[in-house]
Design a protein with these regions (language model features):
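N-terminal amphipathic, basic helical "cap/leader" segment at the start of enzyme domains
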Residues: 2-123, 135, 289
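Conserved beta-strand/loop scaffold segments within soluble protein domains that form the structured core
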Residues: 88, 95-369, 383-407
Length: 407
């Protein structure tokens, strides 16, 4: 979904809530959304930056970022026959006009627009993004995909994806953020909200393959109803800096999440992923398995948490993160955590980090495999369980190429 640079750009430091409101009204947005944007901007302007211990924003000059006031352009391609079943897959801007009641009901119902300064910035300035609605008991067989790119000259992007699967529905949604390398700093602040109805199933793939120079500060939230299931697949390979706060709330009894991700930080990349699962319903399950590779002076942080409320009796949860270091200068921090307020649960976490074992390399070298080839095989095999779950062959192959280029 390429950006359209015909829109006038405004430096973030010079922007006012009046300009934001005027641009929103000029785009035909309803007054309730205009008021939300104004409130979010005031919060952004008045609040201090969040204190993130492991995300260093000192080199990022957000005040110098130029932002477009209005949609940059979003194109959606899909099988129109799905509309006969009541499925809606369109731009979020179009959905505001055609399905305003649904958008108003769900927009901001998972992600708090005033959660912190960058959440508020997104809520004030979001443009582009898709709206996916699957009605009750409808199964969408083929994956639906949205690709967000940066055109030449773009300095920022704020897409918002809103995914709704009603009771008994099933769908696969794939989002990808990708671009060429940039000389200037680029701000990407996307957000994705997912609502999984009772007995519904969502497979969600999020691939971050930005080029150099991109600062990716994103939010992702999913809310699950009774017996709802989400398979969440994350891929974090690009950009200069990444800070993703991702959360799944298992509200319904018997709900389930299976969450895997692959992260590879090399060069001077700093990539942080902060997944959190909150168990509210009874007899819910969460299984998280994250894999990380760091090389050169790359830095990766896994800040994972499983919270089990007092109401979350019968929970079964497992949280794991495993990291491989390919250089002595690379670094990874793994911070898995459990917060348990229920007394009838099964929960555990595990974390490993280190260089490839010499015994493993020696075994491969003794069979005539060159050292570089052996390392390549180990890393690709390490990521394979994650990449194999990507449902689109094209994305799966491109991800494999990107991983190979980093080794």
């Amino acid at each position: 979904m390429p950006a359209n640079n015909t829109l006038p750009l405004t430096i973030l430091a010079d922007l006012t809530d009046t300009q934001i409101a005027e641009a929103a009204r000029a785009s035909g947005e309803p007054e309730w959304l205009v008021e939300r944007r104004e409130a979010a901007w005031r919060f952004f302007a008045e609040s201090l930056p969040p204190i993130w211990k492991r995300t260093d924003l000192t080199k990022f000059r957000s005040e110098n970022i130029a932002v477009p006031l209005g949609p940059q352009g979003t194109a959606v391609q899909w099988d129109a026959k799905l509309s006969e079943q009541g499925v809606v897959f369109t731009t979020l801007a179009a959905a505001l006009h055609d399905h305003e009641a649904l958008v108003r009901q769900y927009l901001g119902a998972a992600i708090d627009p005033l959660g912190h300064k960058f959440n508020a910035l997104h809520a004030a300035l979001w443009q582009d993004g898709v709206f996916l609605y699957v009605p009750k008991n409808v199964a969408v067989e083929l994956p639906l995909q949205a690709i967000f790119t940066l055109a030449d000259g773009s300095h920022s992007t704020f897409p918002h994806n809103l995914i709704i699967a009603e009771r008994g529905a099933s769908v696969t949604f794939v989002e990808e953020f990708t671009s060429q390398d940039a000389e200037d700093q680029i701000l990407a602040a996307p957000a994705t909200e997912i609502f999984v109805g009772d007995n519904a199933t969502v497979r969600f793939v999020s691939a971050q393959t930005w080029g150099k120079g991109v600062y990716h500060i994103g939010a992702q939230r999913a809310r699950l109803g009774r017996d709802g299931t989400i398979e969440w697949i994350g891929l974090n390979l690009g950009g200069q800096l990444q800070h993703i706060e991702a959360e799944a709330t298992l509200e319904g009894n018997g709900s389930r999440i299976d969450w895997v991700a692959a992260t590879f930080a090399d060069g001077t990349q700093s990539l942080l992923t902060a997944p959190m699962v909150r168990h509210i319903g009874t007899n819910a399950e969460s299984h998280l398995n994250f894999k990380t590779v760091v090389d050169d002076s790359g830095y990766s942080t896994f800040d994972g948490m499983v919270k089990i409320d007092h109401s979350g009796q019968g929970t079964n949860s497992r949280l794991e993160e495993h990291a491989i270091h390919l250089s002595s200068a690379s670094r990874s921090d793994s911070i898995p955590g459990l917060q348990i307020d229920a007394n009838d649960v099964k929960a555990g976490h595990a974390s490993t980090s280190g260089q490839i074992e010499e015994e493993q390399l020696f075994y491969m070298l003794s069979r005539g495999i060159k050292r570089d080839d052996a390392i390549h095989m180990i890393v690709t095999g390490f990521f394979e369980p994650v990449l194999d779950r990507i449902p689109l062959e094209d994305l799966r192959e491109r991800a494999a190429v990107l991983v190979e280029a980093k080794i």
